């Protein structure tokens, strides 16, 4: 059996954030199980988050092919620095809420000219290079992971040139049904072009892989011929040294980004009311947001005299530093996207939340995929945004347990471990032989 597999990914260390970890961990455990993964990734990517701590998980024997990429962000930055005196970050192309004229223009250009995304210029040179590479190295299996969905078009190009290749298209997010597209002011022509590209990938890939049951059903309804589900997960190695300790304050933490689609205010209003109604809660509680937080939510907190005393913001931390925080946390706040397809939203961090053993209180669709996992694992609750009394009851119950020193250890076992998930991926790849 040929155990060589080429993985084509935009996000790779030192890139940080959740997008990199899925395939970083798969590569780690594929290598441990006798497979030979090759990783193809940009030499000079434009990403918003850097995390060098993730480099420790890259197996030294894995060949990383770093190939030059040109992205319009670089040119756009030069233009914006001339006209506005500051650079525009990649995330500004998809900013929600109040936008400057420059941001509106950038989003319109991004949505209607760079289809499926701004990495489209990497497709042809990558196909030309990799067509020779897979033949020289006798690779017969390739995996593309998106977003960015341009990478699936690299896979499509390779498959068309080498019909014997087995191609897995991994969707960490939807494509034509992705809520992000609704923020980009797409013309009808642009949206239809997304759908045509998506259809070609769904029809030509030997397997469509995705991360939630909701997305699995979506892709089946869109006509994908072989859809498989392998969720995200947690790496047991990351949690071996995490020790829970009694906290001097009742500590509620949210880890990750806050934006217009992920709104923690329902939980914050409940905490505010509890502070006003319960003196002991008001004295003991502290809330910490770790990661990028938009100005609207910061303003909401800072303008409230109660919340301002209890809520702090910490900028982005390396993954190894984030892991340490789990041991000094009492409740983890999970904020799910409120959007058309929110039922399928399972943030990658949910699985690390589960592995931490801390109680989870979530905001979002109470019948969605994330809520189902949390409920099945007995790890907490997910409440609808308008359930003010539900949030108050959940926080008060957790606070009572903290006061009594009876905080339960809710750590899940191996259902979502990266090692077990890699076994599922291997079974999928072996089915091609």
Feature-to-residue mapping (PLM):
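Conserved donor-binding/catalytic core segment of Leloir-type glycosyltransferases
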Residues: 245-262, 268-271, 421
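N-terminal subdomain of nucleotide-sugar transferases
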Residues: 1-73, 207, 216, 227, ...
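Carbohydrate-associated surface elements
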Residues: 214, 233
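A conserved catalytic-core segment of Leloir-type glycosyltransferases
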Residues: 42-120
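Nucleotide-sugar-dependent
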Residues: 262, 318-325, 332-351, 360-372
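Acidic anion/phosphate-binding donor-loop and adjacent secondary structure
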Residues: 72-78, 234-249
